[in-house]
């Protein structure tokens, strides 16, 4: 029987401490691959804790791929590669970092792209009555206008000299410090402010990254996937290749066969499929990157909206526990947590790329205003951001739960399947319909429903898209609870 010493848990909850202890035992090998774990009830009885605590810890391990379950058999440890949990023993040297005084002075990432197939849709009902399942905007009541205005007034009053001074290329130190601290708390990432680069939108940061790593590299993109990086690379003359995926994400064999040098992935919650990359595939991906001068661009967009369990460990953090020089560039944005119009995104560079960024790209001016950076820094440092995020998560969880309830209670409940609902602000709704996808699109248009289809997110050489047929990408970020009954009624009638 597994024994855990809870006297060492400090301020961790029982669930989190149990999860971490079991995870460490798996990584250390004391819980070997394919070993059966105790039942929830027996482990709870042995440790003197509740069954629900064990259940939640097991579920988190399943979500991250450390454990798998078999019906009527129980829980088992996933077969993993050897993976160190120790801190790296070597120090990272990256040259001298310029001081603050020495530094010289596309639309933001939207969940849904304006492809021709969707932008040409003309609803048969009035625009006022259209239910939009593609919009990336937020409702007014979800933005903290009073707090934001108050902080901005303080910035204007107290930071006049900072506002009028030239911006360093990587952004103001105050915001980079706030982001580094936030990542340490929320994502368990060990980040220094010098590693953080701030920019107006992830698209801008992608363009910097392609210049930093080199336009001559061959980049790989998840297929299906977010379309903007492909458009940016095409505009910059950068070579890229679509990569097939399975239920665990990017297939490593694809990386080798297509001679990929750098790959863009979203392991926490892939868009648009909702796939969460399990730990075994993450280890394989990192092992691939360490075989040569290869890089992983980890887009953590939407990771804040995880509705079950704790936040998943980032590739950036996993990479930092090895003796690797650092193969992962981490990207994220405040688009979804605050508002797309704010246009503040950031990336975190491994140490060996920090000095290279200053030397090669330091001539760029930071594209986010001082006023917005200083306001956001205070918003984070004073604890407003954490409270705002909690409030927003509760709102979206309620909308999602309400929508799922109405869908599962509808007459069409036996004609669809849902996937990818536990993270992010969208899920997939696969329709079992005896009609072509184009016919279904027209029926939904006529019903006044604007919605994207999974097939729209396949890159040009997608191959077999049968699995994507008649699959709707349901983005509920702009959906109001009072619209849900009408939405489900319209869907039922259209089908």
List where the protein language model places each region.
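N-terminal basic, amphipathic alpha-helical segments
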Residues: 1-153, 352, 362-369, 373, ...
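A generic "structured core" feature
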Residues: 179, 227-232, 260, 297, ...
């Amino acid at each position: 029987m597994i024994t855990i010493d809870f006297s060492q848990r400090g301020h961790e909850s029982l669930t989190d401490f149990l999860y971490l202890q079991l995870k460490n035992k798996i990584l250390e090998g004391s819980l070997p691959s394919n070993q059966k774990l105790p039942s929830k009830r027996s482990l709870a009885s042995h440790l003197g804790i509740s069954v629900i605590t064990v259940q939640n810890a097991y579920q988190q391990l399943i979500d991250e791929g450390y454990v798998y379950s078999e019906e009527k058999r129980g829980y088992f440890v996933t077969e993993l590669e050897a993976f160190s949990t120790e801190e790296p023993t070597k120090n990272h040297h990256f040259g001298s970092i310029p001081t603050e005084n020495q530094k010289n002075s596309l639309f933001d990432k939207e969940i849904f792209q304006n492809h021709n197939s969707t932008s040409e849709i003309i609803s048969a009902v009035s625009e006022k009555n259209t239910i939009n399942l593609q919009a990336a905007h937020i409702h007014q009541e979800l933005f903290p206008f009073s707090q934001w205005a108050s902080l901005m007034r303080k910035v204007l009053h107290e930071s006049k000299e900072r506002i009028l001074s030239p911006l360093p290329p990587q952004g103001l130190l105050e915001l980079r410090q706030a982001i580094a601290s936030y990542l340490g708390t929320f994502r368990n990432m060990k980040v220094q402010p010098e590693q953080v680069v701030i920019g107006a939108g992830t698209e801008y940061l992608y363009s910097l990254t392609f210049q930093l790593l080199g336009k001559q590299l061959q980049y790989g993109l998840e297929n299906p996937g977010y379309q903007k990086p492909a458009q940016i690379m095409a505009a910059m003359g950068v070579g890229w290749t679509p990569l097939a995926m399975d239920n665990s994400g990017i297939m490593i064999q694809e990386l080798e066969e297509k001679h990929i040098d750098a790959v863009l992935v979203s392991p926490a919650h892939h868009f648009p499929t909702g796939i969460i990359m399990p730990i075994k595939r993450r280890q394989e991906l990192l092992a691939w990157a360490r075989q040569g001068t290869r890089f992983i661009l980890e887009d953590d967009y939407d990771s804040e909206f995880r509705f079950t369990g704790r936040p998943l460990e980032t590739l950036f953090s996993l990479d930092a526990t090895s003796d690797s020089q650092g193969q992962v560039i981490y990207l994220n944005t405040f688009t979804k947590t605050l508002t797309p119009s704010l246009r503040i995104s950031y990336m975190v560079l491994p140490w060996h790329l920090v000095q290279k960024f200053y030397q090669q790209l330091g001539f760029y001016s930071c594209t986010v205003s001082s006023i917005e950076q200083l306001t956001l820094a205070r918003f984070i440092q004073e604890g407003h951001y954490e409270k705002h995020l909690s409030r927003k998560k509760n709102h979206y969880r309620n909308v999602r739960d309400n929508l799922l309830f109405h869908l599962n209670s509808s007459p069409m409940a036996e004609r669809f399947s849902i996937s990818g609902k536990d993270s992010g602000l969208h899920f997939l709704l696969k329709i079992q319909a005896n009609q072509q996808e184009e016919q279904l699109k027209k029926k939904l248009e006529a019903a006044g429903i604007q919605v994207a289809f999974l097939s729209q997110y396949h890159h040009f050489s997608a191959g077999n898209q049968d699995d994507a047929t008649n699959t709707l990408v349901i983005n509920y970020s702009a959906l109001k609870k009072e619209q849900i009954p009408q939405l489900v009624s319209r869907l039922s009638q259209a089908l």
